Amino acid sequence: MSYFEHIPAIRYEGPQSDNPLAYHHYDPDKRVLGKTLAEHLRIAVCYWHTFVWPGHDIFGQGAFQRPWQQPGDALERARQKADAAFEFFTKLGTPFYTFHDTDVAPEGDSLRDYAANFARMVDYLGERQHASGVRLLWGTANLFSHPRFAAGAATNPNPDVFAWAATQVCHALDATHRLGGENYVLWGGREGYETLLNTDLKRERDQFARFLSMVVEHKHRIGFKGALLIEPKPQEPTKHQYDYDVATVHGFLVQYGLQNEIRVNIEANHATLAGHSFHHEIANAFALGVFGSVDANRGDPQNGWDTDQFPNSVEELTLAFYEILRHGGFTTGGMNFDAKVRRQSIDPEDLFYGHVGAIDVLALALERAAVLVENDRLDALRRQRYAQWDDAFGRKILSGGYTLESLAADALARGVNPRHASGAQERLENIVNQAIYGLR
């Protein structure tokens, strides 16, 4: 059975085409900086927003009528969902996908049900991967939707909830390994608090760290070679989450000695909620040595919640890709579309329109970022700004050649009177615009 029989395979037709079901800028085989666009972008489609979300919101019930979401045998519906998903991936031409455990398999009424159902669906996903050539970018466990996780999973006051969560992660990590996944993501959607009046912050942080340490140990025990990634988010669904942003996650990892084991998966909309730009979070991740992967989407700056819209800003993504490219590009990570169509977009074609347009935006942004990397104008000005630190005096400070007292004495003896230099922000912004809009 075909779920998208009236929709052709999406092909590159070029910028002059007016076909809404074609790529206008994404030519997967086009080479940029020595790699194809497909190799650079490593695009993934997420299971949850695309095939699981029924189109509901807090004010209304599901608006979609997906065949695989209708009442019936839960495992049969899960197989239909997988069939629809892999038909979608294949027609879109995207090389990767991502999932939560309970996206792909019914949870059932017990842990035994969960394990049995998930095992059956992992077998089925393996068959679909083999037949299609589509690969798993990352897997994860849903430790936030069920009421048992209302007070958190790893940070829950009940150790039985901790144990249930550990069981899910154990199975999800095993499944990711078996399916050839390149990363495993840990998003602590409920790892936070609603009120400090009933919260022991130190205890919950210690519990979370213990949980992560167990995941790290299991990764090595089973021989999983992929990366473990935490996905930062400041709030929603909790008032305050412990993985607030990249810097917070890094500090947490350092505190518990996990900084060499876990990196970050950065979502654009989560950066918005944390009061940061997407560019900031990616640059910070590289500066701290924890960059892993990206969830590509956008938020609405007028809304204080996670809208998970498809990315549509070449300007925003150019700066994000500039950081990624100048640091060598993705290794195990990629661009996962953690994005959903709007509730009124009920037609099957809308799923394609959203992804096709966003993929074109990624391609445009990456090519513009490549211009910035190739012409080296931004980096040259940055190097010039800090050039004095590469002189003998600057190197001596950084290498420990001075104490605070001896440096002060040296400054007094030389009569230091430094002059302020221009930051040249306007010039730098012009360089970016020239690259984005094709001026040079």
Swiss-Prot record:
**Binding of Mg(2+) 2, residues:** E267, H270, D306, D308
Instruction: Provide the binding site for Mg(2+) 1.
Output: E231, E267, D295, D338
Q: How is the cofactor bound?
A: Binds 2 magnesium ions per subunit.
GO MF terms listed in the record are: magnesium ion binding; xylose isomerase activity
Co-factor(s): Mg(2+)
InterPro entries from the UniProt entry: Xyl_isomerase-like_sf (IPR036237), Xylose_isom_bac (IPR013452), Xylose_isomerase (IPR001998)
Give the EC number: 5.3.1.5
Which residue spans adopt a coiled-coil conformation according to this UniProt entry? none
Which NCBIfam families does the entry mention?
PRK05474.1, xylose_isom_A
Q: Which protein are we looking at? A: Xylose isomerase
What is the species listed in this Swiss-Prot or TrEMBL entry?
Burkholderia orbicola (strain MC0-3)
